[in-house]
Amino acid sequence: MAGLSLQHPWAFAFGLLGNLISFTTYLAPIPTFYRIYKSKSTEGFQSVPYVVALFSAMLWIFYALIKSNEALLITINAAGCVIETIYIVMYLAYAPKKAKVFTTKILLLLNVGVFGVILLLTLLLSHGEQRVVSLGWVCVAFSVSVFVAPLSIIKRVIQSRSVEYMPFSLSLTLTLSAVVWFLYGLLIKDKYVALPNILGFTFGVVQMGLYVFYMNATPVAGEGKEGKGKLAAAEELPVVVNVGKLAAATPDRSTGAVHVHPVPRSCAAEAAAAEPEVLVDIPPPPPPRAVEVAAV
């Protein structure tokens, strides 16, 4: 790192800044996992983003070790490995059995199987600079696939006309991170670091543009918070139950209150005919908890 800071002071500065921004991005899911810890349930959250983030960090550490003199890449991705591992362990601790099995399979397939194959092929089939080239393009391909993932969120925002699925702060952070790491890769002449971040910057700008365009738009009925609000309002309509046929009502002359007393079935019809209907406003059960899907 000392050599990098002396020979490429600007590269060192951007790399250090990239470490700080990326670290804050790694910490973004903390509120989600605090909620999981408090409720002792994963509440429908998915584990795939954290498994993929762990795989990405492992891949970039391997690349940095093969290339050498890439301490800044190692530090941030090592931190990422630790943080994502903690997230995954917490997820497995509180997830239902089906989600645990699925997460374990994905971990074994991607982080053990695929990573193991990449490691062996890189070490056995290539040598010297060719290792850096081969592994570099693997990192580029995987990073591009990760950056393309937000397309589903972009589609959802356009269809629902609601930005609740795409926080502006996260889009801004990811865009800044892409800019900083692109400049870092450009300054150290590493196209494998720079190229994926061009796409990352592009998607980040598109997301922020969509946020500005739709932040005051009226969500499509049944979508977004407004649609959910209408559904919740419908669920909160009072349930009116006619108890006239089930009980007899007698007024309390001292207070004027009406007391409802159960009567035998044999007298139910007579009570219904003799007494007026008594309407009881019973509040409905609370609406189901909204399921929040977490994204990195």
Swiss-Prot record:
Subcellular location: Cell membrane
Induction details: By the X.oryzae pv. oryzae (Xoo) transcription activator-like effector (TALe) proteins (artificial TAL effectors).
Membrane spanning stretches: 10-30, 46-66, 72-92, 106-126, 134-154, 168-188, 193-213
Superkingdom of this protein's organism: Eukaryota
Entry keyword annotation includes Transmembrane helix: yes
Keyword list, A-Z: Cell membrane, Membrane, Repeat, Sugar transport, Transmembrane, Transmembrane helix, Transport
Domain MtN3/slv intervals: 13-98, 134-217
Protein topology in the membrane: Multi-pass membrane protein
Assigned protein family: Belongs to the SWEET sugar transporter family.
Binding partners and assembly: Forms homooligomers and/or heterooligomers.
Function, in words: Mediates both low-affinity uptake and efflux of sugar across the plasma membrane. Confers blight susceptibility. Confers TAL effector-mediated susceptibility to Xanthomonas oryzae pv. oryzae.
Protein's UniProt name: Bidirectional sugar transporter SWEET13
Organism this protein belongs to: Oryza sativa subsp. japonica (Rice)
